[in-house]
């Protein structure tokens, strides 16, 4: 049962990776990347299966969320700087 959950989560992560590649909008890409980080942290927690696995999954999720927010903030600032006023 546990292996099946890991496989299902892996399939979802792969689908989110494909949708990230096909997305046209930056915000949509970041949304899919965040969904991938949820899936990867779930896979870590399921695979390790101990309290340490839960700690690893939490650390990975927090770090990936901070990274996603930093990327989104940077892209927003770059978008604002590229506005050309007439």
Swiss-Prot record:
Organism of this sequence: Methanothermobacter thermautotrophicus (strain ATCC 29096 / DSM 1053 / JCM 10044 / NBRC 100330 / Delta H) (Methanobacterium thermoautotrophicum)
Protein name in UniProt: Uncharacterized protein MTH_386
InterPro entries on file: DUF2109_membrane, Prd_NiFe_hyd_3_EhaC
Family to which the UniProt record says this protein belongs: To M.jannaschii MJ0526.1.
């Amino acid at each position: 049962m546990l292996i099946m959950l890991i496989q299902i989560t892996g399939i979802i992560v792969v689908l989110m990776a494909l949708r990230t590649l096909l997305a046209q909008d930056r915000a949509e890409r970041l949304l899919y990347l965040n969904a991938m980080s949820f899936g990867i942290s779930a896979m870590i927690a399921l695979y390790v299966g101990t309290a340490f696995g839960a700690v690893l999954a939490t650390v990975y999720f927090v770090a990936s969320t901070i990274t996603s927010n930093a990327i989104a903030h940077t892209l927003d600032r770059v978008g604002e700087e590229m506005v050309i006023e007439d």
